[in-house]
């Protein structure tokens, strides 16, 4: 297309002011106001200019587009005035998908958030005393129940979809100290608060192999610098011994830090001290030991064949003084950073001015309280994250077969194939849960095109594209969403 021809096409586009005052747009103007309508008009006209510039529109196609201008502007208005944050169907098989919001909340948690948010609440009010209270009492009481030593705990099996409670090993002595927990807005904030409270102005000893970077360019050394503590690296990337920690301790040392390698593993010629060795060293040198678990489970994940994820209780029982972890990962609750440990250390953190800057609101407390109550009452199946982890390959296969039978068509080929689900969220990167995938191909479109069509449904369906196929893993799909997937596939076919 010649430049002068493009210029002619540009001249055929109406002005913003012309459309704003056109009789056809009077209803939209009255309904949405001049600001919203002007923005929508500019957005639609801008797209038309881009299409002309790139040669995608000729005179005939431009006239068709101008004929549908009112509809296009109306649609743009509806998009602009609707929610950007919206539900999606997660068919990726990644349970704690960070980009898709991590852990879905339990129904009780959603109900409690609404109940606590629609009116006033006793967030920081002691009803019995009639005076100001503390907001973290609502969840600290539950964490004390869950993280206190428990003997002869009842054990459930994974097959029953109810994770077993963590229990003290037979004959193991129970520690007699209490555990206190405080809440901030995410695990990075928890690490920041812990370092600032316990080590500001001093040194923190950490293994070089644990200086991790996770999503969003979050690096442990950067957080440490912000905390006011000085990083003292010991060992090498693949091998660090307890002697390396001991040699590094000076009068400036304030804290020993263990960081869980959340999203990668080091294998082969490796060595690192055990938690027991670090605890013994910390006690001998009268230093606090803090462990950043990252994800942080409240149940034993080995029943799901998930290895390499220590529980919060495991760390506390081993003698770690402060454990930091996330609320919206393996715990299955809202986004939050949790610090559990020695009450005297927690008291110091509560008195830190940084704590107020990092504290969470009533909605987070409500969602977390309801989630923790499910743990206390052993209603583990009510927590979607734990329920998804407990699903068997056979259960997933039956659901996938039902969708396949309902949506099968000559234009679309579907079959079931073996695959693996991931925990995600940086948890247990090498653990893969056996699953059955619904593999889909379509004669008239590529896998990428089919995937795009699925994402444009309401709610959007997000799967994986591998080897020219769209793969849907129902492990991360809520059962009530199965019919929505079947309907979408039928409409595409």
Predicted regions and their residues:
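Intrinsic disorder/low-complexity segments
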Residues: 1, 148-179
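Long amphipathic alpha-helical segments
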Residues: 1-78
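Short Gly/Ser/Thr- and Asp/Glu-enriched loop/turn motifs at secondary-structure junctions
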Residues: 13-14, 89-93, 331-334, 433, ...
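Long amphipathic N-terminal alpha/beta scaffold segment
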Residues: 55-105, 112
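Glycine-rich phosphate-binding segment of PLP-dependent enzymes
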Residues: 91-92, 104-128
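Conserved PLP-enzyme active-site core in the AAT-like
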Residues: 130-150, 177-374, 488
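Conserved PLP-dependent catalytic core of the aminotransferase class-I/II
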Residues: 206, 364-365, 369-424
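Conserved C-terminal alpha-helix-loop-beta "cap" of PLP-dependent enzymes
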Residues: 397-480, 484-485
């Amino acid at each position: 297309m010649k430049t002068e021809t493009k210029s002619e096409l540009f001249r055929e586009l109406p002005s913003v002011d012309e459309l704003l005052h056109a009789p056809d747009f009077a209803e939209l103007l009255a309904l949405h106001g001049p600001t919203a309508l002007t923005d929508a008009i500019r957005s639609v006209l801008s797209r038309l200019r881009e299409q002309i510039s790139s040669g995608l529109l000729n005179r005939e196609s431009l006239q068709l587009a101008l004929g549908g201008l009112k509809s296009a502007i109306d649609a743009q208005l509806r998009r602009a005035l609707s929610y950007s944050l919206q539900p999606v169907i997660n068919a990726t098989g990644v349970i704690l998908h960070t980009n898709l919001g991590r852990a879905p909340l339990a129904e009780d948690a959603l109900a409690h958030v609404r109940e606590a948010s629609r009116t006033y609440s006793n967030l920081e009010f002691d009803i019995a005393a009639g005076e100001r209270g503390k907001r973290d009492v609502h969840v600290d009481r539950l964490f004390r129940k869950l993280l206190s030593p428990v003997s002869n705990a009842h054990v459930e099996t994974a097959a029953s979809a109810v994770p077993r409670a963590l229990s003290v090993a037979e004959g193991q002595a129970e520690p007699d100290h209490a555990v206190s927990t405080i809440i901030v807005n995410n695990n990075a904030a928890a690490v920041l608060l812990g370092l600032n409270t316990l080590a500001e102005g001093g040194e923190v000893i950490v293994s070089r192999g644990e200086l991790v970077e996770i999503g969003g360019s979050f690096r442990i050394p950067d957080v440490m610098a912000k905390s006011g503590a000085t990083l003292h690296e010991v060992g090498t990337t693949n091998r660090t011994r307890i002697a390396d920690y001991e040699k590094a301790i000076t009068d400036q040392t304030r804290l020993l830090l263990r960081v869980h390698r959340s999203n990668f593993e080091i294998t082969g010629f490796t060595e690192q001290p055990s938690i027991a060795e670090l605890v013994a060293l910390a006690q001998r040198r009268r230093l606090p030991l803090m462990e950043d678990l990252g994800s942080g489970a409240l149940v034993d994940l080995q029943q799901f064949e998930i290895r390499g994820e220590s529980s919060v209780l495991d760390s506390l029982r081993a003698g770690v003084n402060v454990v930091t972890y996330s609320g919206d990962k393996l715990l299955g609750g809202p986004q939050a950073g949790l610090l559990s440990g020695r009450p005297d250390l927690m008291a110091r953190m509560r008195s830190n001015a940084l704590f107020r800057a990092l504290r969470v609101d009533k909605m987070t407390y409500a969602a977390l309280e309801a989630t923790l109550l499910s743990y206390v009452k052993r209603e583990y199946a009510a927590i979607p994250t734990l329920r998804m982890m407990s699903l068997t390959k056979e259960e997933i296969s039956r659901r996938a077969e039902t969708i396949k039978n309902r949506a099968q068509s000559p234009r679309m080929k579907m079959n079931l194939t073996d695959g693996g689900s991931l925990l995600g969220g940086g948890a247990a990167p090498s653990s893969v849960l056996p699953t059955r995938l619904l593999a889909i191909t379509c004669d008239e479109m590529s896998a990428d095109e089919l995937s795009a069509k699925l994402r444009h449904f309401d709610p959007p369906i997000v799967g994986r594209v591998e080897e020219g196929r769209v793969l849907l893993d129902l492990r991360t799909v809520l059962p009530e969403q199965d019919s929505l997937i079947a309907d979408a596939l039928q409409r595409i076919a």
